[in-house]
A protein has these predicted regions:
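Active-site-proximal C-terminal subdomain of hydrolase catalytic domains
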Residues: 129-154, 160-166, 170-171
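N-terminal catalytic or cofactor-binding beta/alpha core of small enzyme domains
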Residues: 1-137, 151-155, 176-181, 185-196
Length: 196
């Protein structure tokens, strides 16, 4: 069986829950031949990626998918690209607020996701769940995590991707999506990880 590491984030920005972790917790333990290994990450620049890499070193996953909250988006949005930039409009959960700093000095300006992000977006949309490909993972901890993982696993067997999800309805913000629908979308994403 293939191994999947799927991560979600703790709450941040004054929220009491984070739909990324709530959804990850509701996924089954096996999907489409992948064993599902979950990991909760801190919303802290650098630390999130360090913890994900530490876990990946333990379980040697075939694929890593990171899930994050994108408040204001109304669709599930697989990310195509990560950029070598840290810019925080609000502090992370440790109080860090970098402004226009590189994630890795001398690193590539941008790196493309190594999962089939466009195919995943189209497959989720075909289920009747709002989804679209995103060309910007932002410049906060989500992008920081994706970029660092893509750099770390560049040229290895481990494929890396990121999927943003909207607020869940339980947060009382708009636009939002029910957790059940978010979970269905993520299950479908995992079912479409392989190109064939």
């Amino acid at each position: 069986m293939k191994s999947l590491l799927i991560t979600g984030f703790e709450p941040f920005g004054g929220e009491e829950i984070n739909p990324s972790w709530e959804a990850v917790c509701r996924l089954p333990d096996e999907i489409n031949g992948y064993s599902v290994n979950r990991l909760l990450l801190p919303v802290v620049f650098g630390n999130a990626a360090e913890e994900a890499i530490r876990k990946a070193n333990e379980i040697d996953p075939d694929v890593i998918i990171c899930i994050g909250q994108a408040g204001g988006r109304s669709a599930i949005t697989p990310e195509l690209v990560a950029i070598n930039l840290r810019y925080a409009k609000i502090p992370d959960n440790s109080g860090n607020q970098p402004i226009d700093e590189p994630i890795i000095v001398g690193g590539d300006n941008a790196l493309f996701s190594t999962i089939p992000a466009r195919k995943i977006a189209e497959a989720i949309e075909a289920l009747g769940i709002p989804s679209q490909l995103s060309y910007s993972a932002g410049s906060y901890v989500c992008n920081d995590l994706l970029y660092t993982l893509l750099m770390h696993f560049k040229g290895s067997k481990t494929r890396v991707g990121f999927i943003h999800v909207p607020y869940c309805t339980e947060q009382g913000k708009e636009p939002s999506m029910s957790l059940d629908i978010i979970v269905d979308g993520l299950k479908n994403a995992i079912e479409n990880l392989d190109e064939s």
